[in-house]
Amino acid sequence: METTSLQRKFPEWMSMQSQRCATEEKACVQKSVLEDNLPFLEFPGSIVYSYEASDCSFLSEDISMRLSDGDVVGFDMEWPPIYKPGKRSRVAVIQLCVSESKCYLFHISSMSVFPQGLKMLLENKSIKKAGVGIEGDQWKLLRDFDVKLESFVELTDVANEKLKCAETWSLNGLVKHVLGKQLLKDKSIRCSNWSNFPLTEDQKLYAATDAYAGLIIYQKLGNLGDTAQVFALNKAEENLPLEMKKQLNSISEEMRDLANRFPVTCRNLETLQRVPVILKSISENLCSLRKVICGPTNTETRLKPGSSFNLLSSEDSAAAGEKEKQIGKHSTFAKIKEEPWDPELDSLVKQEEVDVFRNQVKQEKGESENEIEDNLLREDMERTCVIPSISENELQDLEQQAKEEKYNDVSHQLSEHLSPNDDENDSSYIIESDEDLEMEMLKSLENLNSDVVEPTHSTWLEMGTNGRLPPEEEDGHGNEAIKEEQEEEDHLLPEPNAKQINCLKTYFGHSSFKPVQWKVIHSVLEERRDNVVVMATGYGKSLCFQYPPVYTGKIGIVISPLISLMEDQVLQLELSNVPACLLGSAQSKNILGDVKLGKYRVIYITPEFCSGNLDLLQQLDSSIGITLIAVDEAHCISEWGHDFRSSFRMLGSLKTALPLVPVIALSATASSSIREDIISCLNLKDPQITCTGFDRPNLYLEVGRKTGNILQDLKPFLVRKASSAWEFEGPTIIYCPSRKMTEQVTAELGKLNLACRTYHAGMKISERKDVHHRFLRDEIQCVVATVAFGMGINKADIRKVIHYGAPKEMESYYQEIGRAGRDGLQSSCHLLWAPADFNTSRNLLIEIHDEKFRLYKLKMMVKMEKYLHSSQCRRRIILSHFEDKCLQKASLDIMGTEKCCDNCRPRLNHCLTANNSEDASQDFGPQAFQLLSAVDILQEKFGIGIPILFLRGSNSQRLPDKYRGHRLFGAGKEQAESWWKTLSHHLIAEGFLVEVPKENKYIKTCSLTKKGRKWLGEASSQSPPSLLLQANEEMFPRKVLLPSSNPVSPETTQHSSNQNPAGLTTKQSNLERTHSYKVPEKVSSGTNIPKKSAVMPSPGTSSSPLEPAISAQELDARTGLYARLVEARQKHANKMDVPPAILATNKVLLDMAKMRPTTVENMKQIDGVSEGKAALLAPLLEVIKHFCQVTSVQTDLLSSAKPHKEQEKSQEMEKKDCSLPQSVAVTYTLFQEKKMPLHSIAENRLLPLTAAGMHLAQAVKAGYPLDMERAGLTPETWKIIMDVIRNPPINSDMYKVKLIRMLVPENLDTYLIHMAIEILQSGSDSRTQPPCDSSRKRRFPSSAESCESCKESKEAVTETKASSSESKRKLPEWFAKGNVPSADTGSSSSMAKTKKKGLFS
């Protein structure tokens, strides 16, 4: 087809391509000999590489604080090349070089929002930013991020002014002719994808060197006096050849003389090391000199000072145009590299300047326009990495777009970008969420796993295949299980010696290590082994990395992403006389000098500081010695974690730099996959993996529904003060899913005059620090926050955590509720949610293009939804996500009790079963068939809403009329729209449906996956179709439990007398309510902020469950003293300007109220009070002395002593009664009082049968009556166990429990063995059981006796086991006597004769 006549006329710059190709070789000029083999310029200092918005803002503020007005920083930017027409790329990296020893690289592309701190720095007019083509950078930043670069210094203008010329300088040209060096312009680095995470070492050095070059060129040009200094080398080349020859001859003679004098051996090692370095330098310079003298010259390229010339070679010209900023400065067409002929704002604004410059060049050099175009084109094309092909239609569109934008958009964009309200830009399309912690993980992972991934319709349809869906394990168990460490001592580990215990008590206030703590510490001190430590919040994982350096006297490095948490821990260590510091880029030289002198034991650093200062760590290890390196919050390393931080991925270099230093990775939430990722990323060598249980028994869990009225939802958690004002019962955090919601909740609570503040990542750092500071010091009682708050808070007395909106996954939810009750006292966690809360999460999931990661996040969200809908024990659901199916003993004492969760409390009170119908699988086959068929009938063109309208027979105009005649139209009208939407969510989660995003991220269509289409085909032949799904309350409604009126203390709810657990008096049941009181308001000048509510837990219940009951007088004394201690601590903390909880935790105050020490030495006996803390808490001793003097109560009640008046009463109580732990008491009551079968109790309380049986064995040990037959201890079972115990090899040694278990048949439960042993041990003092005689038969009690004994046992429990013989249970003869003939021992008289002293008294 002939197209010549129809071929449109191309612009001149494009039609010259063929001419350029033909003359390219001839046009190539040779570089000046002065530029041959110039040494490369490299940045010699440390590079700080930051990839998180919060860290970037923090570092930027540090830079602003350290720099003075008028200071200059080297500035540069990088962005990836674009290979498609019409596309544009955003700035990926911003470089700031503040000195010759420090350069900051901010990887903006890994951040979801532009860091506020960096924006303030770039817009700071008092700090100058120097670079080449920097004006183009200004427009680029303005266009990409709405950031206006202020006080920029164009080095081209400075150089032309100083050198008295009018040159078009590139950065490389300035480096060559000002510094006598050259930049390494490797195309593979320069044109690499700067958005990919992480940057390579070559990319880092390249980027840092560019910014460094800008800084030192500015400094060099500032010191120049005139042009002669720059061109002295050129004049020497022309005028001093004879002098140079003389110098060469002289140097050669000196070299020969040195060679003759050189000794055969070097006595000094330093000499031996330095000589090769000097010789290498001389050799390199000699080689360069040879090329300069012997190399060819070209008169056309010889430098002529003072004339208008181009100092750049062709290669340099390419380097000069490597970025859009230089292209925008010097040429319109150099935009080809990023956007082929895309007339952006910067190029349009600079067009006029380019034209003026071209005319000036033509006038000066007399060149024709074609020659100018040719030269410029040659430079532009050499700058370009890839020349894309442009079609005819695309060219027309682009040119038309250029004409329209040039005249219509420039002024509009200028006025918009320069608006003074740009900080308050409201972009309605932005999802209201905490971007710093929500989107960074998604974007960083996208860059980490793949390059550019194009989402296509077919790709999304492939995501729902059978093998790729998240597996659904029963009860949430599966590969993510973690077995917890047993709390028993590891007998293979040596006990800590006296010196180690003394160090522990002196600096940390504890008298012993917890077993898992000692396991980790011993591994570090003795084995020098890497460790992965997963410990529940509040267990004490910080001691694992703080103790070793204190004990060894060396240094411990702690890496944490949380600045505020590190500051609090440094303060806490300093209060205990442990020298510690936070080392960052903004630290003074004095602190760094003290670090090098070994004056600090624990040094906290950020991941960015660590990666940029490995040489400092190596220096510290060689000079002082590093005991360990701890990586706190290590789950941030894993891309699968809920709080992925890309900066942690760079910490793998630690083991390379310091291979002999043990590394400890610590986290409170890490499943098996996350642990493996941690080990891999940190390059740990054969690490010891230690995991404790995840249970937090002091946390009460509750879930409720939002009503839409914020005050109505939150008022149940508030209490009225005496002044009729409202307040929370203790410090409270309210988590909201978006910034907008935090502000709404704060505004509503403000109507009640509550002392609450907002906290989210959109606030300035100074504002966030103020909220954090005031919350720690109890100046505000409540913080309404996004997930940006809390992870770095060191406040142990948070009593309540409320989620006003559904969390996205179990890990983050566990982490957030874990901030409550770290002092070990009772706290509560409440979650109020609505189904719409998951809509934003689903939209975010759709945007994830990595299939594996998307399905993983979907699986996590589905687990969270099941948790919210479930009627099972919420504690069990959470723990089953982290732990193994056994759910070890840490959970047994609380699970299933009224202190556990909102599901256990009503089930316990009303004897309900745990397996309610909505948690069971239901057959939704017919409905699923209808919904999938509707999606297929509508040709997968709509979202899920239209198929639901179709099934419900809606008359909505959104449904096309042509579908209304289909036989399925209206087939599902019996179900509500919300029901169908819930079913669709289940089908999406199970992989039958998939939502496919369109161009607009809020528009998505619903399509069948391969799995869904296969099932639909198979179901069409079934009648009816079957599909089992787990129903929830949306699909199987049940009564919703609203938040309790006093949810903070579920144990305070008064139950009727018949519901009290055995052994617990009414007075004991109501201790929480009795000791809950409010501290007087804190006096504050100018504010009316209420003092935090000090909720006093029962002092009796805080200790061992077996602690004897205390008198009312003692309880009153403890309560009153505790209140005064809280108030005194607050005043003392205010004077010291430290958080009260850091000065002394509530638990310490409770112990002080019980022990009432009056001397510093006695105060040291309290657990958690170190020597340093004891001295600081001395003012509290006066409060104790004054209170005890006024109330006449005894003081200095150390752990070995008891109140004198209660000692005899306590001893008497121990003889009569021994209280049961609450969980044991609940099991005993249900079994003995309510006659529930043991297997039903175990099922109802979600306990293993053996655990429930062991509860009964403990009741037997405590002396409580028990129906042995119903418990399973039948005469036959008793005989089998007794035969094993009394015969060899046991020989009645009841301490050989393990051997007994081996010899007893496996079908007998272990608890029956323990029960039999307890019976024997309780009666061993009053009778001797003869060996079993198989010819004799024991008589089992009759049913009448059993009924009588049950009745008597009930009375015994109610009366708390009165000591009279009338209330004692009548024992069966087969327990009381071992060898009575069954035929002749039926009379009641013989029974009376065999009756002995009660076994259960």
From Swiss-Prot:
Regulation of its activity: Zinc ions stimulate the exonuclease activity.
Residues annotated as signal peptide: none
GO cellular component terms, semicolon-separated: centrosome; chromosome, telomeric region; nuclear speck; nucleolus; nucleoplasm; nucleus; replication fork
Gene this protein is translated from: Wrn
Position of sequence motif KBM 1: 6-18
PTM annotation: Phosphorylated by PRKDC.
PANTHER family: BIFUNCTIONAL 3'-5' EXONUCLEASE_ATP-DEPENDENT HELICASE WRN, DNA HELICASE RECQ FAMILY MEMBER
CDD domains, per the entry: DEXHc_RecQ3, RNaseD_like, SF2_C_RecQ
Binding partners and assembly: Monomer, and homooligomer. May exist as homodimer, homotrimer, homotetramer and/or homohexamer. Homotetramer, or homohexamer, when bound to DNA. Interacts via its N-terminal domain with WRNIP1. Interacts with EXO1, PCNA and SUPV3L1. Interacts with PML (isoform PML-4). Interacts (via KBM motif) with XRCC5 and XRCC6; promoting recruitment to DNA damage sites. Interacts with RECQL5; this interaction stimulates WRN helicase activity on DNA fork duplexes.
Function, as annotated: Multifunctional enzyme that has magnesium and ATP-dependent 3'-5' DNA-helicase activity. Has 3'->5' exonuclease activity on forked dsDNA. Has no nuclease activity towards single-stranded DNA or blunt-ended double-stranded DNA. Binds preferentially to DNA substrates containing alternate secondary structures, such as replication forks and Holliday junctions. May play an important role in the dissociation of joint DNA molecules that can arise as products of homologous recombination, at stalled replication forks or during DNA repair.
Residues reported in the UniProt entry to bind ATP: M535, A536, T537, G538, Y539, G540, K541, S542
Any one biological process term the GO annotation gives: DNA metabolic process
Record-given protein name: Bifunctional 3'-5' exonuclease/ATP-dependent helicase WRN
Pfam family of the protein (one): RQC
Binding site for Zn(2+) 1: D76, E78, D210
Motif (KBM 2): 1367-1376
Disulfide bonds: none
Assigned protein family: Belongs to the helicase family. RecQ subfamily.
Compositional bias segments (type: Polar residues): 1043-1069, 1323-1332, 1382-1392
Cofactor(s) essential for the protein: Zn(2+); Mn(2+)
InterPro entries for the chain: 3'-5'_exonuclease_dom, DEAD/DEAH_box_helicase_dom, DNA_helicase_ATP-dep_RecQ, Helicase_ATP-bd, Helicase_C-like, Helicase_HTH, HRDC-like_sf, HRDC_dom
3'-5' exonuclease domain mapped to chain residues: 51-223
Ranges of biased composition (kind: Basic and acidic residues): 1070-1081, 1348-1358
Region annotated Disordered, chain positions: 401-427, 464-492, 1041-1106, 1323-1401
Residue ranges of every copy of the HRDC domain listed in the record: 1115-1194
